[in-house]
Amino acid sequence: MPRSRINGNFIDKTFSIVANILLRIIPTTVGEKEAFTYYRDGMSAQSEGNYAEALQNYYEAMRLEIDPYDRSYILYNIGLIHTSNGEHTKALEYYFRALERNPFLPQAFNNMAVICHYRGEQAVRQGDSEIAEAWFNQAAEYWKQAIALTPGNYIQAQNWLKITGRFE
C-alpha cells in the first residue's frame, strides 16, 4: 500500500494531499512523478523513524530522479538517516554528494560541522589534542560556509566560532 494511504499524522496527511494535487496539475513526466512519490514516501517513513523503509524509498527515488537539485535533497535525507544511525562517515559522504549537486544547502554544511565537532570532542576525550584541533578546524570551516549562506542562522555555531577564535 502506498505510504500516502497509511499516514496517521495530520501534517503527513496534509503534505500527501498537497503533493498529490501538485503532481496532478504540474506538467511532469511519469518518471518524475514516480521519483517524487518515492521521495515523499521516504520522507514520511523517515519522520516515523522507519529508516530502512525510508532508505529503500530514497534509493528508488535516486534511481528515477534526473534533476541534480532534486537529487541533492534525496542525498541530504539519506545523510540524515546515516547521521541518526551514528554512521558518520557514510553521512559525510552523502552530504558531500548533496553539496556537489546543490552548493546552497546550509543544513548539509551544518550537519557536516556537527559531525566534525563531535569527532573533535571524541579526540579530546581520548587525549589526542592534535587530532581534536584538526576536527574542530574542519567543523569551523563547514560552519562558516553554512553561516555565509544563511547569516541569521546557526547562532550557537557563530558563538562557538567567536569563543574559540575561529570567527573571521
Swiss-Prot record:
Signal peptide: none
Pfam families in UniProt: TPR_1 (PF00515)
GO terms, biological process: photosynthesis
Cited InterPro entries: PSI_Ycf3_assembly, TPR-like_helical_dom_sf, TPR_rpt, Ycf3/AcsC/BcsC/TPR_MFPF
Keywords, sorted A to Z: Chloroplast, Membrane, Photosynthesis, Plastid, Repeat, Thylakoid, TPR repeat
TPR repeats: 35-68, 72-105, 120-153
Gene Ontology CC annotations of this record: chloroplast thylakoid membrane
SUPFAM superfamilies for this protein: TPR-like
Compartmental location: Plastid, Chloroplast thylakoid membrane
Membrane topology, from the record: Peripheral membrane protein
Main localization category: plastid
Keyword Thylakoid assigned: yes
Keyword Secreted: no
Function: Essential for the assembly of the photosystem I (PSI) complex. May act as a chaperone-like factor to guide the assembly of the PSI subunits.
Family: Belongs to the Ycf3 family.
Protein name, entry field: Photosystem I assembly protein Ycf3
Organism: Citrus sinensis
Gene label: ycf3
